[in-house]
Amino acid sequence: MNKLISAKMIYALIGVVLVIAVFLVYKRQAGQAKVSEFGKYQGYSEAMYGGTKRVSDYLTLSNGTKLAYDFILPTQKDVPANKPLPVLFLYTPYLRTFIIFDEDGKDIISGLYRLKWYEKAYLRVRYWIYDRGNLMDPLFRKKWLGNMVKYGYAVVVVERPGTGASFGKLNPSFEVVAKETNEILNWIAAQKWCDGNIGMYGESWQGAIQLAAASTGNPHLKAIFPAASWIDNYSAIMYSGGVYNKAFSDFFTWSQKFLSSNVITPVDHDKDGIQLAQAREERRSAIVSEKIAEASRKIPFRDSLSPDGNKVWIDTMALYPFIDRINQYGIPVYMTTGWYDLCTRDNFLLYANLTVPKRLVVRPLDHEQVDETQFDLDYAAEAHRWFDYWLKGINNGIMDDPPIHYYLMGADKKYAWNVTDAWPPKNQESVRYYFGPGVTGETTSINNGTLDPSPPTAPEASDNYTVDYTTTSSNHSRWTAVNWTHDYPNMRSNDAKALTYTTPPLEKAAQVTGHPVIHVWLKSDVPDLDIFAYLEEVDGGGNSTYITEGNLRASHRSLGQAPYDNLGLPYHCHYKSDMAPIPAGEPVELAFDLLPTSYLFRKGNRIRVTITCADADNFETPVLNPAPKLHLLRDMNYPSSIQLPIVP
């Protein structure tokens, strides 16, 4: 009997072992199966490396300027790769590597990123355990890069002149950037560890730098991967609607001073920091990046001249003049932005004007988040697919995908990602909603107006408003979401101090995807004022959710012809010669677009447009005393309205 039990146990054990073996074989085969689709990638190459080696040194430009760089090579069992590899290159004004703790062990980095307590704890433990745990290097800052290195990519990060440990003076001109990147690309390609194929990556200014690089036609640059970049810095960031963006400017100024502090990392051989000290001394009197924001306040028009006679917003900071050259050389571009980014519109404009191989992804995120894996997308997979295709020649089908992927906010997650081969989507319809009279008994705002698809019939109708300079979209807006995420509050408290126009509860869900355009007719007792318009969703409890926004200074209302395809949106030249005060007692129309969005308004909820004359935490509106009065017109002759891009 015991022998029988023992035999059964042995057979059972053998069976379990066989099941486990079959499972492991199946799992391995499944893991090796080729999958290449949006946000998913496996089986097209093998992770051959398990470690990395980081080296930091100087390279020298033809003008003699020494630039600090980090070079990261994959290793296997501590042995660096012994063959040339494709290189991922970042050219940055934001430091290649950060020092996390000072000599006394004090945390000096978390203020820049607003780290949570557990993130700070992790950095502290890492500092105690690892050899270079005090450094926040490129792979630590961008997790997806580490995956690329495992699959046989090298990484090079170079600090721009006048930043970090680099010598020289920072020149923000993109013409200068193009020349510098061209030299660096040639230098990288000449190194024994590079196989001649280089791709660039990076977000924000680093993304814009890639576009300048693509305009050079350098034969070694095979593809770029910019996130949250722009083509027109004036209207996208610094002077949205002609109004000075103090929130971004103040943050940028503070962050650049921070990045010039003791977080800078010397190169490897500069053990005593002498070269770093020399680099900092060399640029002490230069107009470095921390002064750019200060200077920008003094050039309020697109054609304003700097002290040296330069039209900064056109000649220095704009990228639309480079589009023809980018198209001429045909370097492929994969753009990523977010619906809460500062530069959402500009990414659509860039896409519309490029004729090169291109891809555009729009995520439900802000400026700070779009170049990392988040809940919506495996960003690492997309980076891997893109660079494998263009740098390694792996035919993984990425260019067979629809060219535009966009996330429909408010939808169930399984239906959220949408695709299109054209922008705006071909099935989009522009539906005009007119501002209407107040609803009796409601006290949600100054006027409690309605939003109605039927045109007004009254010969005269208006809403009176005394400007309230305390209105704000919050101090955690998209305009400050650069190193930390946006966090809009319930907008009902702001609505209470504003003019609002709201639909009845929706009988069915409504998808708004595209660029809303607003037309505000007004009279005022002052020659100028600012108009801010917010698109919101109001639920059954009266809670109001921010969706998107637009703004315009009344004196900047003149319309002109854009120097590029601007998708038919209202274009304001913002030239000094175009400034037009509001004529006393006469109606004027302000037509402007709101930043694009894709949002599903739920059945039973309401669509709201909120109008204010200030965004206290974000934009610099002159405060007048007494506060001016505004008459927003909404009659048959002056029908204030909003055009919503509805997708059936």
PLM features: what roles do these ranges have?
Residues 41-83, 502-508, 582:
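N-terminal cap/lid segment of alpha/beta-hydrolase-fold proteins
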Residues 81-93:
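Short beta-strand element of the alpha/beta-hydrolase
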Residues 95-134, 138-145, 150, 215-328:
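Accessory cap/linker subdomain of secreted extracellular hydrolases
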Residues 139-140, 150, 172-192:
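Alpha/beta-hydrolase active-site loop
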Residues 145, 149-164:
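Conserved alpha/beta-hydrolase
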Residues 192-205:
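Alpha/beta-hydrolase fold nucleophile elbow
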Residues 207-218, 350, 520:
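Short glycine-enriched nucleophile-adjacent loop
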Residues 370, 377-648:
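C-terminal, loop-rich substrate-recognition/catalytic regions characterized by aromatic stacking residues
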